[in-house]
Amino acid sequence: MKEMKLYLIIIISVVMSLGACSKKNNAQPNLVEPPVVVPPPPGGTTTGFTISQSLNQATPNTDLDMWTIYSSATQAATDFKPLPAGYDDKILSFVLPKGNMAVFAENQDGTGESICYVAVTSDVKENLPTRLVGKVSYVRMVPFRNISKRGVGYTNFNDVQALKVAWYYNWGFNLVSIPSIQYVPMTWGKNAASAANASVFIGRRDIDHLLSFNEPDGLHQANMPDIDDAVARYEFMLKTGLRMCSPAVTQDNATVDTRWLGQFMTAAAAAKARVDVVALHWYDWGSQTNDKSTDQLNADAILSRFKVYIARVHAAYPNQSLWFTEYNCNPTRNEAVHLLFMKSSAEYLNSLSYVERYAYFFPGVLPATSGTPNYTLTTMGKTWSEIPSPSSLTANVIPK
């Protein structure tokens, strides 16, 4: 109880001291190292995470600790240990206990060929795929929070708490998770994707995913026209051993091979840079003036276009889960259409197993709360807060 009280005091102090970070502001936030939320297992405690030099988890095998990065590299840092003797490039199978995720990588820094497993409904007992047999020099297991799908992007934590979402992000990496709400850091632009920040992320105990660049195809956002440089920056974050989300591009640059995200995914595959989740933005751009005679007909037509877009993206990236980190029916539309689309789109996204998370983007003229000092929910905010949402994942994640 004392630790929980201290934790809440730290959270409140951190949140109150941080200025708002706008999505539309190119300035990178200062990184604030968060408190430790989940301590590592005490000495002598077995985690149940077992690696084996044989197929089907047979002997010889050994257990590894939670949070620690095991590598063939020599590291003096607290969060690193050498792989047990005889296991570098010798791991053939493993047991991952339920409620955790694990990354196995070819290179000692977590880059190169790699794979991320998530044990959601049961322990995962697997042989490594052929592409990693005799190659693993990096292993990390961290706890995985299988939270519900509905979240929000907001720069003020008071708004986030009022909305009663399961997860949030703020286009930066300077806030923290609390027991009821998970935080997902974002390396908004290329300067945020650095070895120094990767080291800090490794030390955090309140995160299991990372969002990467925000609209790198846009001149007024991350603005990263050099695809090879974007992949190289992205690879810094692979060193964390966390589950990785792709850069989130504007809606028209997501599904065509010759557009920004298609080029990035092709280059990432060539570099063997793992992408676990594709992050997406959608605002019905191009149809925002194509309105119907009633709000309901308009919302229905928008939902139909959204469904087509989702199908196209899923067809383009069938091996990745999807997160809609920004979406709405268009900032120019009225509140009635937003409310209708908000409910119908969430219901549809809830029905898709390959869509893990989604976050409605509240237009400036239709905020989620009244703001300071009371942060009372508006009609928009109340509607979003009351939408039911299932768990992000309903099965173990076992890539091939």
Enumerate the language-model features and the residues they cover:
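C-terminal motif of bacterial Sec signal peptides marking the signal peptidase cleavage site
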Residues: 17-20
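Bacterial signal peptide processing site
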Residues: 22-25
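Compact beta-sheet-dominated domain cores in extracellular/mature segments
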Residues: 29-151, 156-164, 175-177, 392-395, ...
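N-terminal carbohydrate-binding/catalytic regions of secreted carbohydrate-active enzymes
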Residues: 86-89, 149-211, 217-218, 227-228
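Solvent-exposed loop/turn segments at secondary-structure junctions
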Residues: 109-110, 157-158, 172-176, 188-193, ...
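Aromatic-rich peripheral "rim/lid" segments of glycoside hydrolase catalytic domains that contact
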Residues: 137, 179-189, 348-400
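Acidic (Asp/Glu)-rich catalytic clusters
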Residues: 159-163, 174-184, 196-207, 233-241, ...
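Aromatic- and acid-rich polysaccharide-binding/catalytic face
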Residues: 170, 185, 214, 261-304, ...
